[in-house]
Amino acid sequence: MIIVAHVLLILLGATEILQADLLPDEKISLLPPVNFTIKVTGLAQVLLQWKPNPDQEQRNVNLEYQVKINAPKEDDYETRITESKCVTILHKGFSASVRTILQNDHSLLASSWASAELHAPPGSPGTSIVNLTCTTNTTEDNYSRLRSYQVSLHCTWLVGTDAPEDTQYFLYYRYGSWTEECQEYSKDTLGRNIACWFPRTFILSKGRDWLAVLVNGSSKHSAIRPFDQLFALHAIDQINPPLNVTAEIEGTRLSIQWEKPVSAFPIHCFDYEVKIHNTRNGYLQIEKLMTNAFISIIDDLSKYDVQVRAAVSSMCREAGLWSEWSQPIYVGNDEHKPLREWFVIVIMATICFILLILSLICKICHLWIKLFPPIPAPKSNIKDLFVTTNYEKAGSSETEIEVICYIEKPGVETLEDSVF
């Protein structure tokens, strides 16, 4: 046990000595890097380089560097190497700083800053272009065996408010290590370039690098300040509409199918929106899907137009633009009744309405009884008159007595006697 205790004490002592050697001396003095430079290596791209201070005291420690971007947009990060690439706009100038740091779990030691700067290019800010917008679009490449798809680039801008009339602008783009100048421009009424078209580029439709665009200019009267801008491809990529959209109606079921757009992305990388418009009542239905088929229950007595659009799903890249709607497809029956049939229906309805009004008037004013009085029923009592006339002449011709006799059956009205 005594031997074991001695061994443990020896190991513990060795561990403490080793930790003491590894811990940085808080009294160590850190010196800033030297020869800090900023070099433009491409459109909207700079290389920061520096060297360790040769007077820095060497210890068994790992020194790091903290880089701070001051302009045009603040940022900071740490690195262990002595150079750093930075993609940023440069028309406003660029400045950065770097310092030596040494950190552990308890504290951070840092040197003073070493700084460098790129000044803004010459020219009045009002001479540079404004409202630069760019879009990309993917098409099938039938001319290259290396790439199945080709990306085009289209950019537009407005002339600077203080730019002289003889100003001419020129556009360049950089993607990765490729830089290209525009050859196809559109011009305004003064002949100044205001748009550019690249039918074929080195841009990768599935790429994630920044697209850098620079527009500079020239004039005989003043210096034109250049303008550069960075674009994320997912934010400017104009997706093509879906292909081969079909729609069929079976009873009250509307079945819609389509194919994925022309794109380097596979079929599972798309979201879709289906728009179904009832042309009779104006009802609009929009459904979002992840498949290339949709079934809807509809009114089979109406006519519909169907359209579909697409967007790259967030599963494959950051959310971007929706495509344009596909060309409308019309399905269904929207035949109207013939004019003659409608005319007959209207006439019959009018006649029924008039008769109803007349009937109400007659009922209210008792005209019906006055116009068409009821016919009395024939009586059931029949009078049988039996008349017997007896002439009796009593001797004398001067006096004549006429007697009329009758027999009345039960229920027969009594007639008055007439004596002549």
Swiss-Prot record:
GO biological process, one term: positive regulation of leukocyte proliferation
A GO cellular component entry from the record: receptor complex
Entry function: Cell surface receptor that plays an important role in the survival, differentiation, and chemotaxis of eosinophils. Acts by forming a heterodimeric receptor with CSF2RB subunit and subsequently binding to interleukin-5. In unstimulated conditions, interacts constitutively with JAK2. Heterodimeric receptor activation leads to JAK2 stimulation and subsequent activation of the JAK-STAT pathway.
Regions crossing the membrane: 343-362
Domain Fibronectin type-III stretches: 32-123, 241-334
Entry protein name: Interleukin-5 receptor subunit alpha
Domain notes: The WSXWS motif appears to be necessary for proper protein folding and thereby efficient intracellular transport and cell-surface receptor binding.
Family, similarity comment: Belongs to the type I cytokine receptor family. Type 5 subfamily.
Compartment(s) where it occurs, according to its Swiss-Prot or TrEMBL record: Membrane
Membrane topology (Extracellular): 21-342
Signal sequence bounds: 1-20
Main localization, broad class: membrane
Alphabetized SUPFAM superfamilies for the sequence: Fibronectin type III
GO molecular function: cytokine binding; cytokine receptor activity; interleukin-5 receptor activity
Keywords, sorted A to Z: Disulfide bond, Glycoprotein, Membrane, Receptor, Repeat, Signal, Transmembrane, Transmembrane helix
Cytoplasmic membrane side: 363-420
Source organism (scientific name): Homo sapiens
Entry-listed glycosylation sites: N35, N131, N216, N244
